[in-house]
């Protein structure tokens, strides 16, 4: 375990040196504070509206940003080390491939955790300080759920990035595959489900479609954050799952299983990768 933490600290130090942590934190802070105050500007209203509306808007934003940032952070974790000549050097030490992968996962996860806490937490603190009529318990509960699930979603895509990096032959290939993966889960998946729903002309059981959302971690993420709120705010196919007989804890478990399965896949691919 000390070896794993050594790798994790090295990745965190690289993130600090490369300004990844600073850039992600500033991006999250600026966008989240902007959405909290100007999210309803299109309707002619400027200022904080409500906790559900703010969380729904932030969830839509993070659905696009968090997977992309995680993929960009980790797509070259393996193939980049190999191209730089450091992977072979690292594996000459008493360090297993699983330990190396876990250390990178923890290090990159710490970068995302700190950026999420600093960036999105600043929006929560700003709302508490500037909007006295907001109930602190409701706000902190909603933002706590939002930040925790955002981090878990990021961990899913970190692990998927490791899987891509473990099978890619060069960094440019891994980058292209990472963007393709982001496009599929964030944009194409829901469009495909809507197309299937329309083209089936009622032949597809309406009970089946909501369960298909569990196959997409970004839809799981949206369901977690919109539980208890108006699911229609999510748009897309997520409102179809408003009557899904699954508890919030089961949704959390499903998203955690996504992260575990993706990390196991990455480990399997990395073990079979010739060095």
Curated annotation (Swiss-Prot):
<feature type="transmembrane region" description="Helical">
    <location>
        <begin position="250"/>
        <end position="270"/>
    </location>
</feature>
<feature type="transmembrane region" description="Helical">
    <location>
        <begin position="20"/>
        <end position="40"/>
    </location>
</feature>
<keyword id="KW-1003">Cell membrane</keyword>
<keyword id="KW-0997">Cell inner membrane</keyword>
<feature type="transmembrane region" description="Helical">
    <location>
        <begin position="111"/>
        <end position="131"/>
    </location>
</feature>
<dbReference type="Pfam" id="PF12679">
    <property type="entry name" value="ABC2_membrane_2"/>
</dbReference>
<comment type="function">
    <text>Required for the assembly of the copper chromophores of nitrous oxide reductase. Could be part of the ABC transporter complex NosDFY.</text>
</comment>
<dbReference type="GO" id="GO:0005886">
    <property type="term" value="C:plasma membrane"/>
</dbReference>
<dbReference type="InterPro" id="IPR032688">
    <property type="entry name" value="ABC2_NosY/YtrC-like"/>
</dbReference>
<keyword id="KW-1133">Transmembrane helix</keyword>
<keyword id="KW-0813">Transport</keyword>
<feature type="transmembrane region" description="Helical">
    <location>
        <begin position="60"/>
        <end position="80"/>
    </location>
</feature>
<protein>
    <recommendedName>
        <fullName>Probable ABC transporter permease protein NosY</fullName>
    </recommendedName>
</protein>
<feature type="transmembrane region" description="Helical">
    <location>
        <begin position="179"/>
        <end position="199"/>
    </location>
</feature>
<keyword id="KW-0812">Transmembrane</keyword>
<keyword id="KW-0472">Membrane</keyword>
<feature type="transmembrane region" description="Helical">
    <location>
        <begin position="146"/>
        <end position="166"/>
    </location>
</feature>
<dbReference type="GO" id="GO:0140359">
    <property type="term" value="F:ABC-type transporter activity"/>
</dbReference>
<comment type="subunit">
    <text>The complex may be composed of an ATP-binding protein (NosF), a transmembrane protein (NosY) and a solute-binding protein (NosD).</text>
</comment>
């Amino acid at each position: 375990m000390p070896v794993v933490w050594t790798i994790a600290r090295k990745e965190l130090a690289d993130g600090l040196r490369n300004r990844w942590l600073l850039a992600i934190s500033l991006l999250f802070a600026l966008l989240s504070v902007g959405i909290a105050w100007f999210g309803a500007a299109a309707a002619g209203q400027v200022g904080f509206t409500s906790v559900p509306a703010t969380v729904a808007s932030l969830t839509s934003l993070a659905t696009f940003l968090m997977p992309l940032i995680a993929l960009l952070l980790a797509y070259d974790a393996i193939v980049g080390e190999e191209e730089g000549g450091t992977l072979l050097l690292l594996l000459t030490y008493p360090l297993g491939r699983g330990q190396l992968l876990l250390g990178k996962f923890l290090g990159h996860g710490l970068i995302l955790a700190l950026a999420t806490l600093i960036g999105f937490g600043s929006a929560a603190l700003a709302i508490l300080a500037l909007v006295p009529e907001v109930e602190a318990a409701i706000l902190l509960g909603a933002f706590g759920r939002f930040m925790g699930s955002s981090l878990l979603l990021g961990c899913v895509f970190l692990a998927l990035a490791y899987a891509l990096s473990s099978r890619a032959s060069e960094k440019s290939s891994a980058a292209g595959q990472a963007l393709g993966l982001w496009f599929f889960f964030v944009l194409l998946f829901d469009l495909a489900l809507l197309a299937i729903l329309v083209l089936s002309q009622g032949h597809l059981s309406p009970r089946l479609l909501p369960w298909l959302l569990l196959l997409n971690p970004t839809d799981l993420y949206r369901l977690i954050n919109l539980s208890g709120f108006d699911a229609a705010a999510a748009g897309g196919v997520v409102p179809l799952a408003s009557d899904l007989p699954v508890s919030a804890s089961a949704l959390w478990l499903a998203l955690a299983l996504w992260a575990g399965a993706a990390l196991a896949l990455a480990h399997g691919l990395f073990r079979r990768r010739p060095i």
